[in-house]
Amino acid sequence: MAVQPATITEQLTEPGDTQAPADRRAEFAALLRGDSTRPFLTSAWQHFVGEEYDPVRFATATVNFNRAWDWDWVKINPRAVYYSEAWGSVYDENDYTGVVPRLVSAAVTGVADLAKIRPLDPRTNPALAEHIASARLIREQLPDLALIQTVFSPLSVLLQLAGLPSYPGAEVSGATEQFTRDDLLRTDPELTHAALAAIAQTFADYVALLVAPVDEGGAGLDGIFYAVTGTASGDFFDRQAFEEYSGPYDRKVLEAVGDGQVVFHTCRADSHPEWFTGYPIDALHWDQFLSRNPALDTDFGVTVVGGVNNELFAVGGDRTEVAAQLGATLAASPKRPFLLAPSCTIPTPADPDSLRRLRDAT
């Protein structure tokens, strides 16, 4: 059953006394085209643990956070596991390790289960319909801000479906499966690619709904924040394997954005942002502070995103270093307007003084 939009007006804080321009959506689009008169636009995002499993509460938390800090654009940051929940993976919403709920049961427990991964209708699938509904609610309350929804790559989702990590060296809380990434991907290549194609088709349809106007049944968003998670990091996959298992499926989803905007994220150290310069994307985000990653002023031919190490925003983090990194980023500004943001999701909770330094950067 599709999740129906609800009202969140009574739960929201009032907007602060800001000097926001009348149409930040147009300003965001102009910056991604490279013709903005402003040198950068600023944002940050975090997980709202405890609010993520209800579309109204999640939308309320998202709107309140963005109103409180008056961000120039909004990355909607839903629970990190809704992608695999769409195909039946189960997580304990009351038992988190950090910002990720504990896995109770994976949808894929063996290679044969790949045959069960079929295309889904995002309008009726509970997990996807829930996030379309929450996105509509956020759009209703933030009509003048560019909104982009987080979408994981099909390869990342397939690994998540099997209870396998999508980051080098990571562990999945609650995972019990004994098969490996190679078992999943290489035992039956035909099944593997059929599953990846089904995920890509599902998320292409989902993305098309996210960017469609509300009066046409969509969520009215400006685009997506597309994350390949850590699948391009280090030697997790070499370039040839990445292109086989991720490339065509990434492009399928990205092309569904149409005229919308795509901010593309590749996570962790040695994350190879140069692999993605030929993708249909508008902005490229990587962690400039981790080893073997390029500096933010590297010219990749698209708008770049970055500015401060996300871990510094933890409560008790080094506020002096936040200020120093901001200063260094602004002093060595990229050659074209850019998006000023942390290098990844900021901690929950985050230090308000450090966030204020980011917000007030000029």
Predicted regions and their residues:
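Intrinsic-disorder/low-complexity, polar/charged segments
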Residues: 23, 54-55, 107-113, 318
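Conserved strand-to-helix beginnings and helix N-cap segments that scaffold or border functional pockets
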Residues: 55-56, 83, 87-88, 319, ...
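Glycine-rich, positively charged N-terminal anion/phosphate-binding segment
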Residues: 27-31, 58-62, 81-111
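Glycine-rich, proline-tolerant flexible connector loops at the mouths of alpha/beta enzymes
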Residues: 75-97, 112-123, 221-240, 343-345
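Active-site loop segments of alpha/beta catalytic cores
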Residues: 2-49, 61, 127-362
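A gly/proline- and charged-residue-enriched helix-loop-helix capping module
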Residues: 97-141
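A residue-identity detector for tryptophan
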Residues: 45, 69-73, 87, 96, ...
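Segments that shape or occlude catalytic/ligand-binding pockets
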Residues: 54-84
